[in-house]
Amino acid sequence: MKTSLQIAAEARLEPIAAIAERLGLPVRYLEPYGRYRGKIDLTFLDDYHDRPLGRYVLVSAITPTPLGEGKTTTAIGLAMALNRIGKRAAVTLRQSSLGPVFGIKGGGAGGGYSQIVPLVESILHLNGDIHAVSQAHNQLAALTDNSWYHGNPLDIDPDRIEIRRVVDVNDRFLRQVMIGLGGKQNGFPRQTGFDISVASELMAILAMVNGVGARAALRDLRSRIGRMVVAFRRDGTPITAEDVRGAGAATVLMREALKPNLMQTIENTPALIHAGPFANIAQGNSSILADLIALRCADYVVTEAGFGVDIGAEKFFNLKCRASGLWPDVAVIVATIRALKAHSGKYDIVAGKPLPPALLHENPDDVISGGANLRRQIENLHQFKVPVIVALNAYPEDTPAEIDAVAHIATTAGAAGMAVSNVYAAGSAGGVDLARLVIEIAERPGPRPVQFLYPLEWSLADKITTIAHRIYGAAAVTFSPTAAAQLAALEDAGFGNLPICMAKTHLSLSHDPALRGAPEGFTFPIREVRLSAGAGFILPIAGTTVTMPGLGAHPAAHQIDIDDEGNIVGLF
């Protein structure tokens, strides 16, 4: 089979105005960026606020291996398959970060015959939103240090300057740095660090902005940026972006980034690509604004939540849906037989290395053993009172006995059904069974109850403990002395009513990536707690999770090059 990059190069793209028409978006709301990309004017939401909403489909996954299980590919393929069988459908996705593209996981744009095109443009810069977020964030960091330097009128405690710099690169050497060296003309020395750009609170804010129209969304963006806590005074009170007089400039820098990007799939299905917060260190979902626009246009909107149900989907419900007022009609869990076997604990899948040969041999018993993870993730979704479908992302080595084992797990765990998806190799034709099952479940009559995991009035510690116990399966939660003090200070400062955005590994239901399947009886450790007042959540950090990834021994960047004709090679 051809590489994803080769397949993308052969795609027959339609002009972006034609994609807007397919979506049902009047062309006057389209701002083209070349022939095949565009942004959507938010005044569409003002003018079409009374259009009925389409069906809302969430795509999540079991706990993935380091290679990923094809969740984005499945989401794209499902939207294409829905279009194929007569439904007007669109997919909403996060924008790719350059860190994973040049690291190891890939670009988050799907693959094979189920991907976003033009591929290179979609994963390299797109329309400049991540640059805008990075620039706005670093401007706020500079203004914070500048206020401290010029007489410190806000009484900034230099040991509690919370905002770090950001860059869209995986670089472990930037996690801890000293700045302000070389004499007073260069500032004052202090220890700080860099995060990857998509871990910026501004990226989380971009994804959480809500509003019934352009002005309302801009006001919400400006207000949220103004509430960002960048430092603390010596008396312990917070200092905001508004206090350092940086909120206005940051909003100006992000003004165009507020508009969702319009792209297309390889079969010309509309794709709204907007915001890119990581799921393991932020909320891991595309923007509310993109979903609202798509739902006012399409019969079906397929959206993807990062990593497994325990991370992206939990945050989708407790953070995104709580803010948007939207609720999905059905949820899809993507699983692969290789990942289920890996969750049996008998196989090691290591990024950048060949799969263990035994993993490719038929073994339905190992599928059943590792199926504990699928069961737990189905149970996790049921806590939100949403019907669940399992999509088995097929590989050539899958056998009928192993597929039957997955179907048995799904049925006995209470899933509404299972469908085999082969969209990577066959495009929309490989997703028709899944699309028909989604329609059947989504259009069943009956109530659609809204069920969050916890009420906001609970204490921060109780909300954290509830997630760890009910979603991860933890027996207990421990808080380091630092985390306990931070929680107390946040509650004293009036932030106790915010929801929780847990930062933890995506490779396990627990905090420990070595614990596979559905671990129980473990203690979940919270080492520190951060405040994202602008985004509107508390960020507890568990285990060894870091907000600046590093590169592996063999990063993808080693394989990427360009030939004399200007063709990119090695990207996928």
Swiss-Prot record:
GO annotation terms (biological process): tetrahydrofolate interconversion
GO molecular function: ATP binding; formate-tetrahydrofolate ligase activity; methenyltetrahydrofolate cyclohydrolase activity; methylenetetrahydrofolate dehydrogenase (NADP+) activity
Keywords noted in UniProt: ATP-binding, Ligase, Nucleotide-binding, One-carbon metabolism
This protein's record includes keyword Ligase: yes
Keyword Thylakoid belongs to the record: no
GO cellular component, one term: cytosol
InterPro entries hit by this protein: Formate_THF_ligase, Formate_THF_ligase_CS, P-loop_NTPase
SUPFAM superfamilies noted in UniProt: P-loop containing nucleoside triphosphate hydrolases (SSF52540)
Pathway listed: One-carbon metabolism; tetrahydrofolate interconversion
Catalysed transformations (reactions): (6S)-5,6,7,8-tetrahydrofolate + formate + ATP = (6R)-10-formyltetrahydrofolate + ADP + phosphate
Entries under CDD domains matching the protein: FTHFS
EC number: 6.3.4.3
One Pfam family cited in the UniProt record for this chain: FTHFS
Residues given in the record as ATP binding sites: T65, P66, L67, G68, E69, G70, K71, T72
NCBIfam families xref list: PRK13505.1
UniProt family annotation: Belongs to the formate--tetrahydrofolate ligase family.
Name by which UniProt lists this protein: Formate--tetrahydrofolate ligase
Lineage: Bacteria, Bacillati, Chloroflexota, Chloroflexia, Chloroflexales
